[in-house]
Amino acid sequence: MVDDSTRKTLSSIPLLQIRAGPREKDIWVQRLKEEYQALIKACTYVENNKQSGSDWFRLESNKEGTKWFGKCWYMHNLLKYEFDVEFDIPVTYPTTAPEIALPELDGKTAKMYRGGKICLTDHFKPLWARNVPKFGIAHAMALGLAPWLAVEVPDLIEKGVIAYKDNC
């Protein structure tokens, strides 16, 4: 069952049509175009968030679209906690969701695998599996990483595991 917040997020991100991964070179280019369009439209979602002061990630990829990297951040008690984010597109994509990593948090929470990969198995991966090939990178960020940050970062801050770094 999907809650109202998830439904609202889903409605702001376009669903994808093309079922292709990095192995299908010709079709992969079309899927990448769809991914970028979804991210741009999700950026309308992000653009709306920017206007309200709650945008939270920036991404870019290598030329092939198989390695993604950037920054994500989480606001807690009016302080901005910023993290590097990275992931590779699996060769079995879109059947397999990307494993999003926050390398600097590696080993700091039980809800993380080696290399800083966040645990999405209980909540996000079943949702992804039901929505192949309609879900893409924008969905992984909004429905996978965002809720993880919302739960884990405040907990890590309260435990003193991560501290605010003034980037000025």
From Swiss-Prot:
Pfam families from the UniProt entry: UFC1
Cellular compartments per GO CC: cytoplasm
N-terminal signal peptide: none
Cited Gene3D superfamilies: Ubiquitin Conjugating Enzyme
GO molecular-function terms, A-Z: UFM1 conjugating enzyme activity
Keyword field contains Transport: no
Keywords: Ubl conjugation pathway
InterPro entries: UBQ-conjugating_enzyme/RWD, Ufc1
Catalytic-site annotation from UniProt: 119
Single GO biological process annotation from the record: protein K69-linked ufmylation
Role summary: E2-like enzyme which forms an intermediate with UFM1 via a thioester linkage.
Family, as annotated: Belongs to the ubiquitin-conjugating enzyme family. UFC1 subfamily.
Protein name stated in the entry: Ubiquitin-fold modifier-conjugating enzyme 1
Species whose genome carries this gene: Drosophila grimshawi (Hawaiian fruit fly)
